[in-house]
């Protein structure tokens, strides 16, 4: 019997949680990559992504949503002064993080607070897909 590790898909797919909960049998989820992030289920139809972007100014961050793909980029402005580090433990590299969004997931806003970039998402169910009551005659 083969086991498939779906955790790499789960980390960057938002809105598919019901499907992954059925497919994923207590698979461990690793949080590799830069920058680190969390995906929070706020309620049944709302999600929040928190990305650790300490050291980035708001003007150095770019968020793009196209089709079902959310792209977050961070690019430091070119620094003119060369520094000599005795120890460098803080990552200062540029990044691009992509999140695959499920159908009907829309970005509602973003804000930067204390080095964390919060991106709010909402599942918007079209009227045609909502359950409707059928009258019995």
Swiss-Prot record:
Subcellular localization: Cytoplasm
One cellular component (GO) term of this entry: cytoplasm
GO biological process per UniProt: protein stabilization
Keywords: Chaperone, Cytoplasm, Stress response
Domain of life of the native organism: Bacteria
Domain sHSP: 28-137
Cross-referenced InterPro entries: A-crystallin/Hsp20_dom, ACD_IbpA/B, HSP20-like_chaperone, HSP20_IbpA
SUPFAM superfamilies the record matches: HSP20-like chaperones
Coiled-coil intervals: none
Function: Associates with aggregated proteins, together with IbpB, to stabilize and protect them from irreversible denaturation and extensive proteolysis during heat shock and oxidative stress. Aggregated proteins bound to the IbpAB complex are more efficiently refolded and reactivated by the ATP-dependent chaperone systems ClpB and DnaK/DnaJ/GrpE. Its activity is ATP-independent.
Family: Belongs to the small heat shock protein (HSP20) family.
Subunit structure: Monomer. Forms homomultimers of about 100-150 subunits at optimal growth temperatures. Conformation changes to monomers at high temperatures or high ionic concentrations.
Name of the protein in question: Small heat shock protein IbpA
Annotated organism of origin: Klebsiella pneumoniae (strain 342)
